[in-house]
């Protein structure tokens, strides 16, 4: 399961490359302020922007059902956040450099939970 989670997160990070999928700002101010950016694959990012980067709080939504709601730093998931998976599973906790890093809880769709300290996407047991 750990490899599955890491694979999904790495896939999301790779697929979220701004340069590979940029379309444009569709609402608000995506330079410095609050705005909505839509990518060519229909992935969206809404909320805070600083110097054209996702920075502060935001919501990133993929057409395949993944939704990240939380903090960004220089367009990377960093701080507190929740990643919701299409199957209903979630990770709620700390992020750094785009990975689960710090205290967090992974909850499977069936309600089973694993909590603890995560490092680079892996639960430290």
Please state what every model-predicted region is.
Residues 7-15:
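Bacterial N-terminal signal peptides
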